[in-house]
Regions:
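Glycine-rich phosphate-binding loops of nucleotide-dependent enzymes
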Residues: 1-124
Length: 124
């Protein structure tokens, strides 16, 4: 029952809750992972490339779920190369290049051009 409820809440499209995750589409796999990870009390979630390769509808759904979890008090470390996603989803950004933090800024201070330069090792 709990699995069916989570599948419904996260709009997972599968023949049944017993369908192996490997038989699901990429978007449905990501939904299952997020449904599983947020099904118990968490203080922190690491989300690495959570919407990479997903269609626009699955992307919007997962981003909304993450934003709701953040609004509910969950701290999320989002790792992404998609600058628009980072600006949409983040309160604060750290830019890493070659394994080192090369920049940090609030969402309000962030500019796509500046972040892009920092990501490639250039000074912004």
């Amino acid at each position: 029952a709990f699995g069916r409820e989570r599948m419904r809440a996260f709009d997972v499209r599968a023949a049944s809750e017993k369908t192996p995750i490997g038989q699901l589409s990429g978007g449905n796999m990501q939904k299952v992972i997020l449904a599983r990870e947020t099904s118990r009390p968490l203080k922190f979630l690491l989300a690495a490339q959570p919407v990479r390769g997903l269609d626009i509808h699955a992307t919007a759904f997962l981003q909304n779920q993450l934003l709701q979890a953040r609004a509910d008090g969950l701290a999320i470390l989002l790792i992404s190369e998609d600058l628009e996603e980072l600006l949409l989803m983040s309160d604060y950004l750290y830019v890493i290049c070659r394994g080192s933090i090369v920049g940090e800024m609030s969402k309000e201070e962030a500019e796509i051009e500046k972040i892009g330069l920092l990501m490639t090792g250039e000074r912004a």
